[in-house]
Amino acid sequence: MNKKLHWKSLGTGTTNLILIHGWGVNSKIWSILVQSQLYQHFKLHFVDLPGFGHSNQLLPMTLNDTAELLSVYIPKNSILLGWSMGGLIASKIALNYPQKIKGIISVCSSPCFIVRPNWPGIPKKIFLKFYNKLNINFDRTISEFITLQSHNTNYLEIKNLKQQILSQPYPTIYTLKKNLETIFKTDLRTKIKKLKIPMLRIYGSLDTFVPKKIREILDILWPKTKSITIAHASHIPFVSHQKEFYESIINFKNYLNTLKITCQK
């Protein structure tokens, strides 16, 4: 029985890129990156979050505890890349352990996923309905989730992605629900505003989970961060729009190199 965090490193580059997956899936969501140009530019670190994939024997943790656990594995001067819920985790790591982090990339994520006064997001009623209907049919839930969020994506690539994800150990319903609770209650809008680490935010113009209005608001709230929206992309742009996605990641790495950043003391 494996009760350790599953962590795998690949790539020929010298810059550490930590890939943090989102809700319901595992590190296989990034499988397409292994064959990409990112492999030459970065040392890619794939992690299965507590309760997911080959870390499924670990109980789900709070956002703080997850950040603490991952920080033990993260090399100094790393770039964090968090997708969806993984963006919350990446942000929390950067807030709690800035001395290790060179930059943050948030992909189709939000500091606050749920709608609030003067803030767009997922309506509470819709979120709670999904939470209450979550059942043991994990295959169907994840398959439908990926399909709905994969507009303009090659059918065979999506089929292969589903197979890769579902080939790994499944999370429990308890894990799925505890992570949904974390998404529901987390609001990092004010805290991230104070973060001094360079940040890139990537959005998809057709993303139904993270409304495009969020980019416009955060461009004002967080003027020191960079942002791009990939046209015609939904919630999984690293699969549907690989060229644009890879270019944005490499350009951000090159930008960080011009700053000659060494991590905060």
From Swiss-Prot:
One Pfam family per UniProt: Abhydrolase_1
Biological or metabolic pathway of the protein: Cofactor biosynthesis; biotin biosynthesis
The reaction(s) this protein catalyses: 6-carboxyhexanoyl-[ACP] methyl ester + H2O = 6-carboxyhexanoyl-[ACP] + methanol + H(+)
Classification via InterPro entries: AB_hydrolase_1, AB_hydrolase_fold, BioH, Carboxylesterase_BioH
NCBIfam families: bioH
HAMAP family (alphabetical): Carboxylester
Subunit structure and binding partners: Monomer.
Identification of the protein by name: Pimeloyl-[acyl-carrier protein] methyl ester esterase
Species in which this protein is naturally found: Buchnera aphidicola subsp. Baizongia pistaciae (strain Bp)
Taxon lineage: Bacteria, Pseudomonadati, Pseudomonadota, Gammaproteobacteria, Enterobacterales
